[in-house]
């Protein structure tokens, strides 16, 4: 079963500010994750149902939340990994 993709309002604004090539890379990975969103190696510790997608070469991260009851994946935050800022922002949302 495939999940639907949703964005938190703040995350959508961050998404729109991304360079087109970064968006395409994330989009490709998100399509894979909609089919299988719970990837154990990508689970965020201390945050139930939250996972990350990493673009190592660019240093960007995308944090998303899986809601099984509604069959949706919600993008919580998108940003550079610098000093784990994207993870801190996601923790506040």
Each language-model region and where it sits:
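Compact soluble domain cores
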Residues: 21-35
